[in-house]
């Protein structure tokens, strides 16, 4: 036997309204504000398109968070078309009733709680999504001047064709410059031509996060750069796998790099920068760093080749002096003087919270130079030193230094190389001895801490 919850008075009222769509539409002007979210949700669920189209035109909140109800997939295409038809009617009006409040149609997968609220004050929280530079007001008693409306969406470009809903939306916004805003953009395709067409439709001022995760040539990146420079609200930029064609002159290479790096002058809100597997970075990092206009909170340079001069330029960059997160994993430092990295750690010691040096191939002699600087990072909470060859002796010294860091809660290391035999065989007895020794080292600590050891040998190092 199954039991179903008894419908509330609210749900009964909503269902009663939807039994006659024409009657429901005629009564929208007198409908209490609190009934709009549940009525819209019910009409959406049961595809009462006449009601949906009419409700869009008299929506009593600044934001209609449609993305909290639907995904931008083909199965919702008809519903999206109806909603946009209603928006069309609004856009064609020269003046609106004073009750008109809609400023944002949000198609992002957010605000799912909105549709479960009843109180008007909670529902009005959607207005936080409104980001307007200017307001036009008219104190007339019955009408207000036409104001701008924004449609927000998160974009993801993949090698396959765009989803039906996205394609329809892009057709709908053609000729309506500045109507479509995007805060998160992900690019997973090398075909820039189609991306540019969409970028030219977007109001790029609203862009906050961009992720480029495909194999672009340096020339492709340079062509994308002017659009990036228009993203003046950009806070997070992730770039991976940019390669350089073999037949390219140093002059041409420098010109393309400058086309990209010069755009950072415009990014006054940039806080997170991630560069992964960027082949042009070695010896060129200073070109980018000197274009940073604001302090970064997070810097990730991973699986890249860097020179000693690149590390020195990091220590001299004002934009990294307030770093909270530093990730250099996969940057091989074996043959590089550790002094620049030591200075870098000292520079960010007052703010650094996470440090990732996984697979940097740092050897004991280099680590010894870094220890005093590492122990001065008073805000450090996480330290990743996996896949670096380390001896028992230097590990014990390292733990003595990190023991001074009261906020450190997680440390990750590879098992010292002495634990392995000549052929890389793992010796459990040696590991148990090491555990006992390290436990004695950690006993004086006055706070909880996790020290994690990997027993997987590092193939490149042989440990």
Placement of each model-derived feature along the sequence:
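Charged, low-complexity intrinsically disordered regulatory segments in eukaryotic signaling
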Residues: 1-6, 333-342
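Extended amphipathic alpha-helical scaffolding regions
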Residues: 153-157, 168-173, 182-187, 192-200, ...
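Short amphipathic alpha-helices and their capping/turn residues within compact interaction modules
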Residues: 18, 22, 36, 40, ...
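Conserved hydrophobic beta-strand positions in leucine-rich repeat
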Residues: 64-67, 100-108, 155, 178-188, ...
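A structural signal for leucine-rich repeat
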Residues: 197-202, 222-231, 248-267, 285-295, ...
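Short, solvent-exposed loop/turn at the beta-strand->alpha-helix junction
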Residues: 19-23, 33, 48, 113-115, ...
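Helix-rich alpha-solenoid scaffolding regions
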Residues: 53-92, 228, 234-236, 244-275, ...
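Cullin-RING E3 adaptor/co-adaptor recruitment helices
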Residues: 1-218, 243, 386, 417, ...
